[in-house]
Amino acid sequence: MKKNKANKNTSGNIAQNKKARHDYFLEDKFEAGLELQGWEIKSIRAGKVNITDAYIIIQNAEAYLVGCRISPLNQASTHVVAAPERARKLLLKKREIDRLMGARDRQGYSIVATSMYWKKCWVKLEIHLAKGKHAHDKRDTLKDKDWQRQKERMMKHSV
């Protein structure tokens, strides 16, 4: 018989970076795998991950996730030194890395992490090419959101 593992979070989103949608115009989307250690997987299953300030750097034709915090569990292995904010290598194809590098260097884009999720048994990271917003752009998007809410409210009450 198959045992149910109710405490494991193996479906859907692990973490989201909602701040990225507010601070950047998100354009091209990529899916990347992560090179993780055993204690990091255990912490991710427990939900102890934060990607709010995460971004991607490219060095020596390899992409790394920087600013992602994975807090170690208390039961984690004692013989491994846990570094919660270490740079984690992203698993991308060569042409994807080349495209990211070109856009970052020539057009002034940033590369930000927007979502971390499970895909089957693998942890995947959704990254976007992004262009920074100015203060007036942020205000405009907030005004548009408020207007959309008001329209929905008016339509709901008028019916």
Swiss-Prot record:
One Pfam entry for this protein is SmpB
Q: Does the keyword RNA-binding apply?
A: yes
Q: Write down the CDD domains for this protein, in alphabetical order.
A: SmpB
Where are the residues of the annotated region Disordered?
A: 138-159
Query: Which cysteines share a disulfide bond?
Result: none
Q: Which UniProt keywords apply?
A: Cytoplasm, RNA-binding
Matches recorded under SUPFAM superfamilies: Small protein B (SmpB)
What Gene Ontology cellular component terms go with this record?
A: cytosol
One GO molecular-function annotation for this sequence?
RNA binding
Assign the protein's first listed, main location to one coarse class. cytoplasm
A Gene Ontology biological process in which this protein takes part is:
trans-translation
* Annotated compartments: Cytoplasm
Q: InterPro entries in the record, alphabetically? A: SmpB, SsrA-bd_prot, SsrA-bd_prot_CS
Judging by the UniProt lineage, the source's domain of life is Bacteria
Q: Which HAMAP family match?
A: SmpB (MF_00023)
So what family is this one in? Belongs to the SmpB family.
User: What's its job?
Assistant: Required for rescue of stalled ribosomes mediated by trans-translation. Binds to transfer-messenger RNA (tmRNA), required for stable association of tmRNA with ribosomes. tmRNA and SmpB together mimic tRNA shape, replacing the anticodon stem-loop with SmpB. tmRNA is encoded by the ssrA gene; the 2 termini fold to resemble tRNA(Ala) and it encodes a 'tag peptide', a short internal open reading frame. During trans-translation Ala-aminoacylated tmRNA acts like a tRNA, entering the A-site of stalled ribosomes, displacing the stalled mRNA.
Know the name of this protein? SsrA-binding protein
Tell me the organism: Alteromonas mediterranea (strain DSM 17117 / CIP 110805 / LMG 28347 / Deep ecotype)
Q: What high-level taxonomic lineage is stated for the organism?
A: Bacteria, Pseudomonadati, Pseudomonadota, Gammaproteobacteria, Alteromonadales
